[in-house]
Amino acid sequence: MSPTQCPEEDVITAEKATYSSITLHRRCPQAWKYRYIDGLRRARSESTPALDFGSWFHAARAADRLAKGRAEGTLKVELEEIQTTDTGPTFPGTVSPAEIISASQDYWDRLGETARETWLDWLGQPLPQRLAHIYAEWRERWAEESENEAVIAVEQRWEREIPGTGVTLWGYADEVYQDRKRGIVVVRDCKTSGTLGQVTSLDEMMDSQVQLYAWGLSPDCAEWSLPAPRAVAFDRVRSKAPKTPKITKAGKLSASVKDYDLRTYLDWCADGVPFEGMKKDGSAAGTYMAEEAEIERLASPQVVSQWFARHLTPVSRYLVRSHLQAAADTCSDISRTRVRADRRGEAPRNFGKAACQFCEFADLCRAQMVGGPGGEYAPEEYGLRYRDPSHSGR
């Protein structure tokens, strides 16, 4: 995008913002103040499996892609370290996926019994078992596509100013790669979630995060003598473990359990599954073996997409322009929030169930609305903590 295509109407007090900062301010300026001015966070907990499993898988995935880039000589930037969770280990950038999966066992063993139960309730399997399973399945699912991809960078930091605004955006891209067949550079975002819902190409085109990342990485690509990113890719992975198949007395697969993948099915019936039959004398008993029809069903794109899904979406300069204008406008609002917070000790609040129901700062916010912003409020009494001292206030 050329400077003449960028928003220039507003000159904003210099702001340096991430996508997360912008979206939180859009949700509620007061919540933004708690996080980015006061430096508050939710108190650390051993029981955040949805977030922490995603961090562990991202770490194994990053190690895998870095190794591919090194082996093929396409990697432009080395990653110094790979992080897992707040309470988990940090690895050197040269770590292997196998080492990360092995370390997850030590992490799992250190969790308290209550925390492990919470993990099992949500994930369906112990962390090490699920991580090993999903990583193996992910590699197998995308092995053919991976041959067509030249890994350029992993967890790549970018920073770029929106011309004429005083706003600098920055962030980290999960992966930058070159599609060898299409001859284009692609920015990829990896997301883990409990289950994979239906996501359309339009939904992903309107996801400003990765579209902005493609724009932000254009100068880096130029330094690497590569063209600007032409597309963004989404790599979606289901976190929750597959169920174990069940069999009826008659030796048929139970219709009550269908939420399993091919690997789980084949492992389950590898040695045969005995069934007692419907006759009292046991004459109808037998052993269930893998069915070709079930294997074909589980290998079908429709079923596989319930566990792993990828989409490629073109970068639109007009869409990027719209997102940049929106980002600049939000940063203008952020500048005003800083002034109001400095003068009054609080920011505007977006009241409403959607904004407040699941807000991590809701209890503190309610207390300050009653007692005023100038009182003494210990964060730990509201399930919060201060971030580390290096917090920049941005």
Where are these regions (language model features)?
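Cysteine-cluster motifs in flexible loop/terminal segments that predominantly coordinate metals
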Residues: C6, R27-W32, R263, C269-E296, ...
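Short acidic, Pro/Gly- and aromatic-enriched capping/linker segments at domain boundaries
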Residues: E8-I22
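Short amphipathic alpha-helical segments and their helix-coil junctions
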Residues: V11, Q30-A43, V187, S193-G197, ...
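Nuclease catalytic cores
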Residues: S21-G69, P128, E155-Q156, K353-D363
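Short loop/turn segments at secondary-structure transitions that flank enzyme active sites
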Residues: A31, L40, A63, A67, ...
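A non-catalytic, helix-rich entry segment at domain boundaries
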Residues: A59-E155, E161
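Surface-exposed helix-capping loop/turn segments at secondary-structure junctions
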Residues: A67-K76, E145, D220-P227, S335-F351
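Mg2+/Mn2+-dependent nuclease catalytic core
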Residues: E149-D329
